[in-house]
């Protein structure tokens, strides 16, 4: 299992998560991997300088997200833009909480409570051609106009208040 981390104070993390800490995510995933006899690989955000406590069985990745994604059974992240690299592979992508990348047959929005069931069923509902179509949309439309257009004003105000509380 591959866990791609996001900066905790990044707007994507704040907007799309339940403001859980990366250390909490790691601890949770380490427990799930132990219970299911799985190997955990984590990749911190390149700008994250915080020290994380990991078990000896957890690997820290330094190479490309896309390369690692090709070698694992599942990828999990909190709306990291690195998800775009995963979408270029055939590996199932699971997005914790809300995400701009969560679309039917592209990548699945989940909560932490869903992970054990995902591993036990091992039946991802994702489709490569739909991923390709979604990537084309992202590259040709979404990125041209900006992410903010996809939110209503109430949501933008709420999230900007959360950001200001941190600052």
Predicted regions and their residues:
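A donor-sugar binding/catalytic signature common to diverse glycosyltransferases
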Residues: 64-109
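Short loop/turn segments at strand-loop or loop-helix junctions that form parts
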Residues: 1-10, 44-45, 98
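Catalytic donor nucleotide-activated moiety binding site of glycosyltransferases and closely related
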Residues: 26-61
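Alpha-helix N-cap and loop-to-helix initiation/capping positions
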Residues: 17-24, 63-64
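Glycine/Thr-rich phosphate-binding loops of Rossmann-like dinucleotide-binding domains
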Residues: 11, 50, 85
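A structural signal for isolated positions on well-ordered beta-strands in alpha/beta enzyme cores
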Residues: 2, 39-41, 94
């Amino acid at each position: 299992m591959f866990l791609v981390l996001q900066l905790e104070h990044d707007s994507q993390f704040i907007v799309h998560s339940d403001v859980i800490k990366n250390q909490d995510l790691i601890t949770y995933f380490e427990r799930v991997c132990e219970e299911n006899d799985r190997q955990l690989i984590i990749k911190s955000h390149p700008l994250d300088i915080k020290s994380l406590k990991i078990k000896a069985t957890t690997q820290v990745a330094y190479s490309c997200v896309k390369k690692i994604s090709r070698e694992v059974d599942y990828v999990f992240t909190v709306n990291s833009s690195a998800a775009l690299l995963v979408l270029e592979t055939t590996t199932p992508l699971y997005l914790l909480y809300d995400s701009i990348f969560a679309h039917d047959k592209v990548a699945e929005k989940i909560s932490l409570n869903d992970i054990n069931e995902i591993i036990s069923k091992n039946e991802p509902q994702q489709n490569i051609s739909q991923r390709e179509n979604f990537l084309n949309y992202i590259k040709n439309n979404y990125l041209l106009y900006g992410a903010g257009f996809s939110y209503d004003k109430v949501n933008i105000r709420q999230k900007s208040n959360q950001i200001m509380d941190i600052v």
